[in-house]
Curated annotation (Swiss-Prot):
GO terms for biological process: L-leucine biosynthetic process. It comes from Paenibacillus polymyxa (Bacillus polymyxa). SUPFAM superfamilies: LeuD/IlvD-like. Heterodimer of LeuC and LeuD. GO terms for cellular component: 3-isopropylmalate dehydratase complex. Transmembrane segments: none annotated. This is 3-isopropylmalate dehydratase small subunit. Belongs to the LeuD family. LeuD type 1 subfamily. Catalyzes the isomerization between 2-isopropylmalate and 3-isopropylmalate, via the formation of 2-isopropylmaleate. Keywords: Amino-acid biosynthesis, Branched-chain amino acid biosynthesis, Leucine biosynthesis, Lyase. Its EC number is 4.2.1.33. InterPro entries: 3-IsopropMal_deHydase_ssu (IPR004431), Aconitase/3IPM_dehydase_swvl (IPR015928), AconitaseA/IPMdHydase_ssu_swvl (IPR000573), IPMI_Swivel (IPR033940), LeuD (IPR050075). NCBIfam families: leuD, PRK01641.1. CDD domains: IPMI_Swivel.
Length: 178
C-alpha cells in the first residue's frame, strides 16, 4: 500500500510522507527496513519514483499523492497507473509519466548500474534525460502540463477566471433584479 489505512484519519495535506510505503519501509518492530530500495542512502532526496505497472491501484483517496509529495517525490514514472490515482496526482502537483514497460525496465537497469544516478525530468520539453545519453520524450496533455507548470489546482484554475465569474454574477443579478 502507498499509505496504510490507519494513517488516513486526517484531512490536512501535510505530514503523510512519514507513512509512505510504511509496511515496506519499516519492519514489524518499527525499524527501518534496509532492504527496501527507497530506504537505501543512495536514494536519499530522490524526487523521481520509478515503479511497475498499475501504480496507485487501491489508492483512490488523495492521501496517497499527499504522502508521495510530502515525502519529496515530484514525479512518478510507471507503465500504467490506476485511473483515480493518476488524476489525483495532477490535482496535487505530482507529474505521473506513462512509459512503456521496456523503457521503465531500462530506467531500473540504469539506476542499478550507476551510483548517484540521476534522472532529469523537463516538463517544458516533456523529456527525461540522464548523464549517460538517455533521452525519452513522454506524452502529456497540454492542459495538464500547464496546470503543473503554473502550480495550479482546481481552485487555482477557477480563480484565474475570477473577474469573468464576478462579471457574470453581476450581469445575472442585474437581470434578476429588473
Amino acid at each position: 500500500a502507498i499509505i496504510p489505512k490507519q494513517f488516513l484519519k486526517r484531512i490536512e495535506r501535510t505530514g503523510f510522507g512519514q507513512f509512505l510505503f510504511y509496511e515496506w519501509r519499516f519492519d514489524e518492530a518499527g525499524n527501518i527496513n534496509p532492504e527496501f530500495e527507497p530506504n537505501k542512502p543512495r536514494y536519499a532526496g530522490a524526487s523521481v519514483l520509478i515503479s511497475r505497472a498499475n501504480f496507485g491501484c487501491g489508492s483512490s483517496r488523495e492521501h496517497a499523492p499527499w504522502a508521495i509529495m510530502d515525502y519529496g517525490f515530484r514525479c512518478v514514472i510507471a507503465p500504467s497507473f490506476a485511473d483515480i490515482f493518476y488524476n489525483n496526482c495532477f490535482k496535487n502537483g505530482i507529474l505521473p509519466i506513462k512509459l512503456s514497460e521496456e523503457q521503465v525496465e531500462d530506467l531500473f537497469q540504469r539506476t542499478a548500474k550507476h551510483d548517484n544516478y540521476q534522472l532529469n525530468v523537463d516538463l517544458n520539453e516533456k523529456t527525461i534525460t540522464d548523464d549517460y545519453g538517455l533521452r525519452i520524450e513522454f506524452d502529456l496533455d497540454e492542459h495538464r502540463r500547464q496546470f503543473l507548470l503554473q502550480g495550479l489546482d482546481d481552485i487555482g484554475l477557477t480563480l484565474q477566471h475570477e473577474s469573468e465569474i464576478l462579471a457574470y454574477e453581476q450581469k445575472r443579478a442585474a437581470k434578476q433584479g429588473a
